[in-house]
């Protein structure tokens, strides 16, 4: 079973994503901030980091940057209302990260995750 680490500070969105991703067959470990997610990344491997960009304690771009230092093969997907930030070539976001802009259809999220993990 593929393991997803989810970092999303919006409680309702996080609960919704966890439920949907588990229903799609993924094991999901979730946190409401980047710092806690980063701590878990240091303890165990994941197939995908699914993260919001704007979060307290550590933003999603910094989390993704640090995560790929630990595991260069980790797939990264940003879910955000601030797509321009992630796509900015001057940002520290990993170059092969995917960005899904809020609002999005759950079907689109699951399809993008499946594509990323198949390519792994």
Swiss-Prot record:
Its main location: cytoplasm. Keywords: Cytoplasm, Phosphoprotein. Residues 3-117 form the Response regulatory domain. Gene3D superfamilies: 3.40.50.2300. SMART domains: REC. Is phosphorylated by ChpT-P on Asp-52. The keyword Phosphoprotein applies. The keyword Phosphoprotein applies. It is found in: Cytoplasm. Disruption phenotype: Deletion of cpdR does not result in a gross defect in cell morphology and has no effect on intracellular B.abortus replication and/or survival in human macrophages. GO terms for biological process: phosphorelay signal transduction system; regulation of protein stability. The modification 4-aspartylphosphate is found at residue 52. It comes from the Bacteria. CDD domains: REC_CpdR_CckA-like. GO terms for cellular component: cytoplasm. It holds the Pfam family Response_reg. Component of a regulatory phosphorelay system that controls B.abortus cell growth, division, and intracellular survival inside mammalian host cells. This signaling pathway is composed of CckA, ChpT, CtrA and CpdR. CpdR is a response regulator substrate of ChpT. Unphosphorylated CpdR controls steady-state levels of CtrA in the B.abortus cell, likely via CtrA destabilization and activation of its proteolysis. This is Response regulator receiver protein CpdR. It comes from Brucella abortus (strain 2308). The lineage of its organism: Bacteria, Pseudomonadati, Pseudomonadota, Alphaproteobacteria, Hyphomicrobiales.
């Amino acid at each position: 079973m593929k393991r997803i680490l989810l970092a999303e500070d919006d409680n309702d969105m996080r609960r919704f994503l966890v439920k949907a991703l588990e229903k799609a067959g993924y094991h999901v470990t979730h946190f409401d901030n980047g710092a806690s997610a980063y701590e878990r990344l240091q303890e165990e491997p994941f197939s995908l980091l699914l993260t919001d960009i704007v979060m307290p304690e550590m933003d999603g771009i910094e989390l993704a940057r640090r995560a790929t230092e630990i595991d260069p093969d980790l797939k990264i997907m940003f879910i955000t209302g601030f797509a321009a930030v992630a796509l900015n070539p001057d940002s520290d976001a990993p170059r092969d990260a995917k960005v899904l802009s809020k609002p999005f259809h759950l079907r689109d999220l699951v399809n993008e995750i499946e594509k990323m993990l198949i390519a792994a």
